[in-house]
Amino acid sequence: MIAATPMPLLKQPDRLEARLRELPAEPGVYFMRDASDRILYIGKSKKLRSRVRSYFRDLERLNPRINLMVRQVCEIEIIVTDTEAEALALEANLIKQHQPHFNVLLKDDKKYPYLCITWSDDYPRIFITRKRRLGNSRDRYYGPYVDTRLLRHTLFLVKRLFPLRQRPQPLFKDRTCLNYDIGRCPGVCQSLIRPDDYRKTLQKVAMIFQGRSSELVELLEAQMLQAAENLEFEKAAKIRDQIRGLEGLGAEQKVQLPDDRISRDAIALAMDEQHACIQLFQIRAGKLVGRLGFVADAQSGSAAAIAQRVLEEHYASVDSVEIPQEVLVQHDLPEAELLEVWLSERRGRKVEILSPQRQIKADLIAMVERNAEYELARTQQSAERHTASLIDLADLLDLPELPRRIEGYDISHIQGSDAVASQVVFIDGLPAKQHYRRYKIRNPEVRAGHSDDFASLAEVLHRRFRKFAEAKARGESLAPSEQRQGSLLRPDDLADFPDLVMIDGGKGQLSAVVEVLRNLNLLEDVKLCSLAKKREEIFLPGASDPLPTDAEQPGVQLLRRLRDEAHRFAVSFHRQKRTERMRRSRLDDIPGLGHKRQKELLAHFRSIDYLRLATPEQIAEVPGIGAVLAQQIWGYFHPSETA
């Protein structure tokens, strides 16, 4: 018997009221779950009953994002704690573990890079990335940094002060490269340094990005004196050069405070109706050592609430040694005392949160706020350009509304071999890579020597829109108005219905897609166009001639960016599949013949050609190959003689 799908609590008033009455008036953490038992949101409260009830009391006063979340809640779970500070610590850990969608305040903004140290590797790498992956919890990310140039320059100098791994992969299999010869790498590729010793070097480097350069200088000075006492003068000279380099690196910082004994962070933000741009300055030993930048949804709360949440997310992701003695804030935080207690417990020493009104600290906050306003202005200008592109495209294609979600499709193959397709998604004019999809073409007629782009596109569009056709047949709305905003939030339901679909190709490719959508009874629902490469011509369904366009108009340029991205994504997937096929041995197709036995066979016979000429008895002489498997191998190369 199939279990019934749970209904949202808002549609079950009696059950909702009973569940709310069960909640204790004690501190703790609460979980909001949907019909699929996924965690939508994790929160904390001093009084669980009051906080959870507040979500369901008046939905209209909630911001649109939380309103959407509450309408999906089917179950509420709690964990009771002794204190509110314990609840805050538990909430931070649970959010980090589960990453609930509606807890993600900060947008995935690629313009601010991170510095990553892969502690999960035996010999960790250090590199700059614009994507904060969560693949291994042991890897450490610092940032996001506002000044990309300064970050690259700092890493450049660090790699010359300390002997570090310079390459993702070794250049040679059996010898070191030039970096080892000139002293920039300790010979990681040939294991010329023990992993523990290499990690000690990298731990010193990490101190620089933790804002602990002064502490590192003191450590190196002690090591230099010890080396000199031991008559290790060459080692002492190297450490001396490292100290001088670190002092020179610190001298480049422009902002200084007279009090160099206290570590402090200063946070401020600027916001409009849509965007909140947050800047966090890290002051250590009286100098500005780091500028971090964040972008959040302005509708997620007040300026003070957003600042509080940013600080909670930021400090939950850093090591305890990176938490400063003081945190200067632009606005009084709604739960400043609670945050102070939590940070003090994590740091092991007292942390103060201050909202300065005058003198040097107030001037520092004002400077951070000016930088936040500058980033907001840049964000607004970028958003205006993208909006202008969407308006122009809607006018060009005569769309009923702005195409906030656009999907682009392309096919990639070489004469039918390794045929694949790509689906890329632009939301509000920008790539939304979390929604990208890749397809392997399953059509048996599409194979090496037999290509068919029309059939491939037809297959992919059928697979993509089949769920919408089934929903329409059941009488469901493809994009409910109350979920329209959710199309950006929930890619796994019917709310991801596109406003526009673009096909990379001309009239032929577009006609193949039109036929598929007609068969699915979706032709009237899906807005379609195609963009041909040769003359950058735009075609619409049923039109024999391309639209008259100007190649420089914003809407056309947006389609070209979408087309180029779909092409890039398809080609990269095709190359991946082709490389995998080329790396596969012909012996992979023989059942029971694993990688180890394949190596034994090739080592014995030197090549597959010689193996093909061998008798079953000769094959059976190879270690690990019995008579039965030898007969199977011989039969694979001589199918006509075994038939």
Swiss-Prot record:
Cellular localisation: Cytoplasm
UniProt-listed CDD domains: GIY-YIG_UvrC_Cho
UVR domain residues: 214-249
The keyword Cell cycle is assigned to this record: no
Protein keywords: Cytoplasm, DNA damage, DNA excision, DNA repair, Excision nuclease, SOS response
Top-rank taxon, per record: Bacteria
GO biological process: nucleotide-excision repair; SOS response
Principal cellular location given in the protein's record: cytoplasm
Domain GIY-YIG: 25-104
Record-level Gene Ontology MF annotations: DNA binding; excinuclease ABC activity
GO cellular component: a single term: cytoplasm
Coiled coil spans: none
Keyword Membrane: no
SMART domains the record matches: GIYc
NCBIfam families to which the protein is assigned, alphabetical: PRK00558.1-5, uvrC
Family, per entry: Belongs to the UvrC family.
Function of the molecule: The UvrABC repair system catalyzes the recognition and processing of DNA lesions. UvrC both incises the 5' and 3' sides of the lesion. The N-terminal half is responsible for the 3' incision and the C-terminal half is responsible for the 5' incision.
Assembly notes: Interacts with UvrB in an incision complex.
Record HAMAP family: UvrC (MF_00203)
Name by which UniProt lists this protein: UvrABC system protein C
Native source species: Synechococcus elongatus (strain ATCC 33912 / PCC 7942 / FACHB-805) (Anacystis nidulans R2)
Upper lineage: Bacteria, Bacillati, Cyanobacteriota, Cyanophyceae, Synechococcales
